[in-house]
Amino acid sequence: MVTWVTPFPPDEKVKGLNIIDASITATILPDVDMNDMRNVNKGMSFVREFGRNISTLAMQAKGLKEALVKGKYDAVITEHFFSDTDAGYAAVLQVPWIQVNSVTMQPNYEHQMDEVRTLSTVPLYFNPSEIPMPFLNRLKNVGMFAFMTGAEWLERSVVLSLYEKLFAPVAAARGTTLPPFPDAYYNVSILFVNSHSSFASAMSLPPNVIEIGGYHIKEDVPPLPKDLQDLLDSSPQGVIYFSMGSVLKSANFPAVTKKELLKVLGELPYTVLWKFEEQLEGRPKNVHIRSWMPQASILGNPGFRVYTNHHCLALLPISFGVGAVCFILPNIPISRH
C-alpha cells in the first residue's frame, strides 16, 4: 500500500493507493503573481519563501498528520520545491528518505549529498557561460555561489523554526524523538535530479544521485484532439505554440503586454496556439487560445514550427525529445538568466 499526498487527487479510487488530498496547497496560487516584478526581483528568496509556504499548507491536508502518527512505512519520497523543511517526514517516520528535485544538480544538492563542489567547472543556473569557463566566469561563479550561500544562511533560522513547528508535535504524538535539523537534512538515501546530458552540464555524481530528466515524457504520444488536428491541417504555413506553463499564467500579463503580444502574433503568417487561462477579447483570426493544450502532441506534429516558453525544466525536455525549435522568454528567478 502506498500513501500518496497530492494536490491533484484522482476522481476515482486507485487500487493500492491511499490518497491524501493536499489541494489546500493550491489556495496560495491566486496570491502569487509571477509577472509581478516585485516578486521576480526578490530572486531566490521569493522562491524559497513560496516553497516554505507550500510545506506549511501541505501539513494542513486532512489526514496527513494522522498518517504520520499512526502509519507504518518503509520509505518516504518527497519532491524538493525549495523547502528544506520536508526533511521532517522521513525524520519523524525514521525510514529512508528518497528525494526528487525539480532542477538540475546544483551546489546546494552537492552540499547535501556531501559531493565535491563543481564551482570551477560547471556554471550555476544564474551564470550563463561557455564551457570550459574562462577565469573571470569561474570567479563570477564562486561569487554568486557565496552570495546564494549567504542568503540561505540568513534564512536558516526560519527553516529551523518551521521544521520544529511542523514536525516536533507530530514526532511527539508518534512517540519518537525528532532529530536535529542537520541530521535529518543530510540523511538522504537517494536523490533523483531533473537533469540529462542533453540540456545540463556533464558532471561526476555519487552513486545515490540519479539523473531522470524527461521522466515525465510518455514514449507513446497520444494523437491530437480532432479540433486541434483540423486546425493544424488547415494551417499551410505551420503553427507556433505559445505557453508560459502552469505557474506563470499568460492571463496575468499586464493589459499592455497582452495587447502588444496580440498585435505581434496577429502579424505573423502562422497559426498561433496560445495557452491562455481565460477569455481574450480582440484576438486576431490566426490566434487560438485554450486553457490547456496537449503540448507533447503539438510539438510532435509535422505542422509545428516554433515553441515559445519561459525556459521551464518541465517543458524543455519535451521539446528536445522531438527536436523542436524554441524561442525563450525567461521570467521567473531560476530561468531569467
Give the location of each predicted region.
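Catalytic core of nucleotide-sugar-dependent glycosyltransferases
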Residues: 1-337
